[in-house]
C-alpha cells in the first residue's frame, strides 16, 4: 500500500496583497489554524419520467455559482492587527492569495476577498486570540506550480 503525500497545516497560507504594481502578497502573522471552503451553488430541478409521468421524479442539479471562504484562528499579533482592520474597514474587497503547498507542487488561488468578520477574545492572564472570516468577491483564479 502506498502512503499518501500530505502536508502540514502551516503550508496552508492566507495572504493579503498591497496596492503595489505588481501586487506583493504577505501572510499576516498570528494564525495557528486556518480553513479553506470551496462551495458550488446548485439549483434543483425535477426530472420527470417521460414514460410514467406519475412516477416520483429524480432531482437534477445545475451549477449556478462558485465561492470560496477562508477562516482562521490564532493569536492577535501586534504585527498584523492593523492589516486585518484595514482590510475589514475597506469598502472594497482586498487582493488575496491562498496557497496550499505540497512537497512536489503548490496549488494557489488569487483574486479579491472581503474580510467578513474579525472576532477578538481574551481571558484574564491569557493572550488575546482572533478569529477571522473572509469571502471571495468574484473569481479566484487557480494555478498549480511544480
Tell what function each PLM region has.
Residues 144-146:
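Short acidic DE-rich linear segments
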Residues 2-73, 114-128, 133:
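Solvent-exposed edge beta-strands and adjacent loop segments
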Amino acid at each position: 500500500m502506498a502512503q499518501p503525500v500530505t502536508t502540514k497545516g502551516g503550508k496552508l497560507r492566507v495572504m493579503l496583497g498591497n496596492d503595489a504594481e505588481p501586487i506583493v502578497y504577505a501572510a499576516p502573522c498570528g494564525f495557528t489554524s486556518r480553513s479553506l471552503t470551496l462551495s458550488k451553488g446548485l439549483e434543483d430541478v425535477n426530472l420527470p419520467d417521460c414514460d410514467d409521468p406519475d412516477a416520483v421524479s429524480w432531482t437534477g442539479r445545475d451549477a449556478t455559482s462558485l465561492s470560496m471562504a477562508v477562516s482562521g484562528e490564532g493569536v492577535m499579533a501586534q504585527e498584523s492587527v492593523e492589516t486585518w482592520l484595514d482590510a475589514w474597514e475597506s469598502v472594497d474587497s482586498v487582493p488575496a492569495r491562498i496557497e496550499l503547498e505540497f512537497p512536489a507542487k503548490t496549488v494557489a488561488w488569487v483574486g479579491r476577498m472581503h474580510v467578513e468578520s474579525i472576532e477578538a477574545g481574551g481571558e484574564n492572564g491569557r493572550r488575546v486570540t482572533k478569529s477571522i472570516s473572509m469571502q471571495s468577491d468574484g473569481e479566484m483564479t487557480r494555478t498549480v506550480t511544480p
